[in-house]
């Protein structure tokens, strides 16, 4: 016989097991084994509203100046904050996400006095976190490097960023250049938008030459890294022109240069946060729109070369708010906007945003804490596939600084057990060719190619953490058995 497929029986080549289906399963699709012994089609299931974990209390009192980063070297979440239960000292703590819960190690005081305008990001090249802030002692700008070890963290000494009065710090890691960029408002007379490129070595950081992107008194600065263009984007209020703007920065060595400004709003913004949607390949900004009753607003930006343009803004909530954050969830391919809802008792609230082209659509609002919520910041944890929110909240006159998780989507591809031999109705029993068998009712394969299970249930030669097996023909695959 000329074709191997002629040797295989219709449907499958052995190792078939009957399972009860949880949900409808199509013919020849990948399935995962559930904890109750049923099987479901491999898919990414969107959660709207998000599934929230329980709050984990970091300390009892209010916290301020929240900054959050994800340490991809240690698979940990780092939270930095002003601890009002301990003389307002600047403190950091390491969180471990397990399922929907997050637990914390011991806190570490990295500066025994107050600071303001705290910002933090993880430098993946060095495997360290970098914080930057305005020191209350001299009003100068400083940075420090933090090292995570297990569930603990320690910091190196202060390094001067700006030897003049500086504020509005925003730290972002540029993955293309392998450098950390610090944006801030600096001299002269606190009206210049300035940036420096930092190189982390051990527990310290050194900075290149100063670069200025505007002299128009920028405020409410936020930034993000666009991994598609390999650029960083800084968003700010142009307080001289009374408008909201953004500009693209290109890092080369220890220097940064800037393109032309793009306008995202004809009025000022108050408080902004910025993230990058790697699925849509767009920048997403959440900001308080001073041009529209201080409503919380979001907008999508597109980087092209050294320029950035914006789509049409969308109101998140029609009430005044200056307390919000936006983070991209790579599991759901959505952004999560978290905010204090002044129209609903100042409760902590979220909306899920879906970016399409230069537009964004929003889900209904979902409350995650029924109490006054302040100093919100979040970060996506790819290990747990959840966003971690850290914030200060007050319920019944008691203040607590807490963190909790939000799950926007769940994936079951790591539970891959085999391929269905025929369509199976929900709650019905049907045959599945399990790992170690040969499934011969798949389509679109290339013989002798290795295939992997993708998070959406498809088979692809693109590597993933789940090996499916090797194709024997265009319709048959020898399913790998390793567990």
Tell me the role of every PLM-derived stretch.
Residues 1-77, 81-83, 91-98, 116-128, ...:
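Extracellular receptor-binding modules and their adjoining Ser/Thr/Gly/Asp/Asn-rich linkers
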Residues 191:
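Polyanion-engaging groove/track-forming segments
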Residues 89, 295:
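Short hydrophobic/aromatic beta-strand or adjacent loop that forms the aromatic wall/cage
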Residues 53-62, 106-114, 157-165, 209-217, ...:
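Short loop/turn motifs that cap or connect beta-strands within the blades
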Residues 47-54, 98-106, 149-157, 201-209, ...:
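Beta-strand initiation motifs
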């Amino acid at each position: 016989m000329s074709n191997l497929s002629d040797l295989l029986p219709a449907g499958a080549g052995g190792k078939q097991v009957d399972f009860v289906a949880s949900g409808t399963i199509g013919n020849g699709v990948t399935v995962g084994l559930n904890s109750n012994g049923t099987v479901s089609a491999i898919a990414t299931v969107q959660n709207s509203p998000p599934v929230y974990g329980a709050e984990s209390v970091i300390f009892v009192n209010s916290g301020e100046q929240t900054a959050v980063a994800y340490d991809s070297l240690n698979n940990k979440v780092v939270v930095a904050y002003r601890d009002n239960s301990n003389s307002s000292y600047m403190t950091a703590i390491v969180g471990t996400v397990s399922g929907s819960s997050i637990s914390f190690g011991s806190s570490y005081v990295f500066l025994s006095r107050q600071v303001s305008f705290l910002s933090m990001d993880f430098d993946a090249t060095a495997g360290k976190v970098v914080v930057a802030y305005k020191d209350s002692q001299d009003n100068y700008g400083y940075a420090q490097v933090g090292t995570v070890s297990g569930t603990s963290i320690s910091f190196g000494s202060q390094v001067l960023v700006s030897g003049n009065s500086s504020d509005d710090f925003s730290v972002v890691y540029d993955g293309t250049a392998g450098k950390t960029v610090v944006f801030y408002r600096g001299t002269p007379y606190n009206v210049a938008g300035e940036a420096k490129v930092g190189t982390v070595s051990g527990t310290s950081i050194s900075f290149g030459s100063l670069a200025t992107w505007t002299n128009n008194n920028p405020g409410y600065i936020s930034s993000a890294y666009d991994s598609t263009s390999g650029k960083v984007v800084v968003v700010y209020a142009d307080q001289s022109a009374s408008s909201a703007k953004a500009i693209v920065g290109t890092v080369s060595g220890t220097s940064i240069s800037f393109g032309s400004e793009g306008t995202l709003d004809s009025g000022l913004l108050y408080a902004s946060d910025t993230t990058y949607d790697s699925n849509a390949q767009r920048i997403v900004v959440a900001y308080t729109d001073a041009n529209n009753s201080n409503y919380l607003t979001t907008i999508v930006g597109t980087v092209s070369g050294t320029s950035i343009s914006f789509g049409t803004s969308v109101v998140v909530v029609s009430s005044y708010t200056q307390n919000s954050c936006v983070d991209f969830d790579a599991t759901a391919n959505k952004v999560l906007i978290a905010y204090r809802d002044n129209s609903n008792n100042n409760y902590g609230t979220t909306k899920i945003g879906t970016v399409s082209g230069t537009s964004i659509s929003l889900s209904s609002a979902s409350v995650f804490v029924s109490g006054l919520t302040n100093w919100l910041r979040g970060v996506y944890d790819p290990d747990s596939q959840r966003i971690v929110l850290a914030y200060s909240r007050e319920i019944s006159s008691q203040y607590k600084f807490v963190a909790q998780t939000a799950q926007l989507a769940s994936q079951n591809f790591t539970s891959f057990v085999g391929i269905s031999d025929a369509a199976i109705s929900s709650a019905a029993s049907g045959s599945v060719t399990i790992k170690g068998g040969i499934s011969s009712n798949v389509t679109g394969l290339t013989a002798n190619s290795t295939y992997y299970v993708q998070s959406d249930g498809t088979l692809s030669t693109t590597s993933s953490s789940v090996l499916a097996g090797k194709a024997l023909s265009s319709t048959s695959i020898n399913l790998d058995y390793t567990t």
